[in-house]
């Protein structure tokens, strides 16, 4: 059973996810059978690792394809070793008229959402020379039948081995800094190398998302493994929070994918 004190380490808006993941951990503890989750972003993966760590004999494994960001998790007893096939992933590749239409990440995701598919059922979407996306295997037949057009263009879908997942050509830059606090405006100021006033304006104009949700409060407190999207600049991922300096500043390590 989870220690109630674990909630104090997370945000209130994350409590629902914590409860869902805790229920799955309880299932494994009671029935000794592995449980598979939906796709989790890096923050969700971190939360699940913390929860599993509060149980004595549970293990968690993640997989979403080679070098994936979004992953499914298998919660199990320590003795269980999952295989890749246990994660029930399907990798789809899209064939489309490249000369006549340009497809981007948002077009793929938007089309999937319009078919009634929840975000948690979709893993990484890779837009490169080729376009691929990962989803839960149970949706494969539905997608093959229903997904026929994207952005007005006819498309064909092919199921290919997950091991053939192409690698994103995104070039993330690793960085570190010391900040006076973990307020959203303070950290964004450091990341984009602009004034705190500009950082606040971006937040107040709803141009900043944290873990895919718009945040319009400058004093929002960031935590480890948060994903930040800043309209007009790009994305950032807080990979680690270090200790305090003598001047009570916090070391942060992060990576950026800016334009």
Where in the sequence are the language-model features?
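A basic, amphipathic helix-loop patch mediating RNA/tRNA/ribosome contacts
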Residues: 175-224, 241
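Charge-rich, low-complexity terminal tails
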Residues: 223-226, 255-257
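Ferredoxin-like alpha/beta domains used as RNA- or RNAP-binding modules
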Residues: 1-185, 191, 234-259
């Amino acid at each position: 059973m989870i220690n109630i004190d674990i909630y104090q380490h997370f945000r209130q808006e994350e409590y629902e996810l914590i409860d869902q993941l805790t229920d799955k951990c309880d299932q494994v503890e009671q029935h000794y059978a592995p449980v598979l989750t939906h796709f989790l972003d890096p923050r969700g993966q971190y939360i699940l690792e913390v929860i599993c760590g509060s149980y004595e004999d549970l293990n968690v494994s993640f997989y979403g394809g080679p070098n994936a960001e979004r992953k499914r998790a298998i919660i199990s007893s320590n003795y269980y070793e999952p295989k890749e096939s246990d994660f029930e992933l399907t990798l789809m590749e899209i064939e489309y008229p490249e000369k006549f239409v340009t497809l981007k990440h948002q077009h793929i995701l938007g089309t999937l959402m319009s078919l009634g598919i929840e975000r948690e059922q979709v893993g990484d979407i890779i837009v490169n020379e080729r376009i691929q996306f990962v989803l839960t295997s149970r949706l494969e037949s539905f997608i093959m039948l229903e997904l026929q057009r994207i952005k007005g263009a006819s498309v064909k879908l092919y199921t290919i081995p997950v091991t053939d997942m192409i690698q994103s050509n995104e070039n993330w830059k690793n960085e570190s800094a010391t900040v006076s606090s973990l307020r959203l405006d303070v950290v964004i100021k450091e990341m984009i190398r602009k004034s705190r006033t500009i950082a606040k304006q971006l937040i107040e104009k709803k141009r900043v998302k944290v873990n895919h949700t718009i945040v319009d409060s400058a004093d929002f407190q960031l935590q480890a493994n948060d994903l930040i999207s800043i309209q007009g600049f790009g994305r950032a991922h807080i990979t680690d929070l270090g200790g305090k300096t003598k001047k009570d500043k916090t070391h942060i390590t992060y990576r950026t994918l800016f334009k």
